[in-house]
Amino acid sequence: MLGKIALEEAFALPRFEEKTRWWASLFSTDAETHVKEITDINKIRIEHADKHGVGYQILSYTAPGVQDIWDPVEAQALAVEINDYIAEQVRVNPDRFGAFATLSMHNPKEAADELRRCVEKYGFKGALVNDTQRAGPDGDDMIFYDNADWDIFWQTCTELDVPFYMHPRNPTGTIYEKLWADRKWLVGPPLSFAHGVSLHVLGMVTNGVFDRHPKLQIIMGHLGEHVPFDMWRINHWFEDRKKLLGLAETCKKTIRDYFAENIWITTSGHFSTTTLNFCMAEVGSDRILFSIDYPFETFSDACEWFDNAELNGTDRLKIGRENAKKLFKLDSYKDSSA
């Protein structure tokens, strides 16, 4: 399929090459290739995209990114630097690339202002944030965005009419030591990423964020970070138990309603037709978006799987590009009508 849109595609600042190399050594079997791919924007990426039928990519800063910086001033300065940098890069090939804003999430008003700057000045397509913001004197605290203090930020998202991508980050500090240190091979895609994001997004559901901001659009990667597979059980306990005990005060709709109206999932890093079909049955093809998770995953694995998956033509087009066109209000790009 030509003209696919991919929207969980990472980059890193070239000046952090050594840090990126060290980070890559923790998970990549070819750290040097990873460094080259994640710091490149307009050459290697486009070559891969041309070969595999990806017409447009929305780029975002690699995890853990700014969410790993617990000093608010340093975090904000880096977010601005990243946004200014990627704005210059995507301007080279605007028919191939867009960008998500990188945000320091220490202060909701500051985050809202930076998002507005990126959308209004640069035309960014929304924001991607790597789960909770590390905070406190030693970085061991976590800031969640699922309480009323963050209403000013979510209101800005809806005013700008742009989505927010809740991406994972690695567990740190006390949480890492108590839960993951003795189970280090479960950190990341095998388990910890889904734990973090599903907790955060379901917290937004139960704490009434979507009821207060009914037009808010949230994206979850990796086919929904396990939530679609627990949809029946979550719905059963919310509706038949928790709401009778008080959840109804803050959570007015069903979990299925929120997935139909506020939550999207992507195929990033999860290239299974069986799993995709299950998610289509639970949340519908209208709420699923193609993505790769490059360079942590490859264009070839993602695209060859998707192009050859047993899907009907309508669903392939929806997931591959048409849903994203509508969500991000995209104009013409390479092979957008192929």
UniProtKB/Swiss-Prot annotation:
Coiled coil: none annotated. Keywords: Decarboxylase, Lyase. Pathway: Aromatic compound metabolism; benzoate degradation via hydroxylation. Disulfide bonds: none annotated. The keyword Magnesium does not apply. SUPFAM superfamilies: Metallo-dependent hydrolases. Homotetramer. This is 2,3-dihydroxybenzoate decarboxylase. It comes from Aspergillus oryzae (strain ATCC 42149 / RIB 40). The lineage of its organism: Eukaryota, Fungi, Dikarya, Ascomycota, Pezizomycotina.
